[in-house]
Amino acid sequence: MMIVIMDNGGQYVHRIWRTLRYLGVETKIIPNTTPLEEIKAMNPKGIIFSGGPSLENTGNCEKVLEHYDEFNVPILGICLGHQLIAKFFGGKVGRGEKAEYSLVEIEIIDEDEIFKGLPKRLKVWESHMDEVKELPPKFKILARSETCPIEAMKHEELPIYGVQFHPEVAHTEKGEEILRNFAKLCGEL
């Protein structure tokens, strides 16, 4: 009974783990090369795809999406994980107008479960060059900013979410609440 974080080599992976542990959620970081059978044997209640440097180095994250019906749990993609989900489902990923390594104000346009109870505007920490340029079919936009039109998205039928920013970083307003909402979706809180 835990949430599994698939490590794509991002600098903030341990902060995701630390935040969830602080909330009382059993959490485990695993290499993104972990075989599907091993991940299934862990019986995760939720899966997080961490940020990282490159879409070419996301290991078995795509395989988890390919075999989603065998897991059937909420998934949250953060930064690179968000882009990976978009690309897998037929969206387009490309260079942003400018590289973002700063606080950005996002506007929540659909709170869904992940932003439940949060203010409509939040300052969040971004650290990326690429972004989702075109929403995949069957996804809806949950949040946007002036520089990035797809800051957060969700599959219309499945509990699969992506956020371009880093909820696990202290600079992000209400980041802990976003991760708490995800853990609730997973039945872990």
Curated annotation (Swiss-Prot):
UniProt-listed Pfam families: GATase
Gene from which this protein is expressed: guaAA
Fetch the InterPro entries from UniProt.
Class_I_gatase-like (IPR029062), GATASE (IPR017926), GMP_synth_GATase (IPR004739), GMP_synthase_A (IPR023686)
Protein name in UniProt: GMP synthase [glutamine-hydrolyzing] subunit A
Gene3D superfamilies recorded: 3.40.50.880
Keyword terms of this UniProt record = ATP-binding, Glutamine amidotransferase, GMP biosynthesis, Ligase, Nucleotide-binding, Purine biosynthesis
According to the record's subunit comment, the protein's assembly and interactions are: Heterodimer composed of a glutamine amidotransferase subunit (A) and a GMP-binding subunit (B).
Coiled-coil residue spans: none
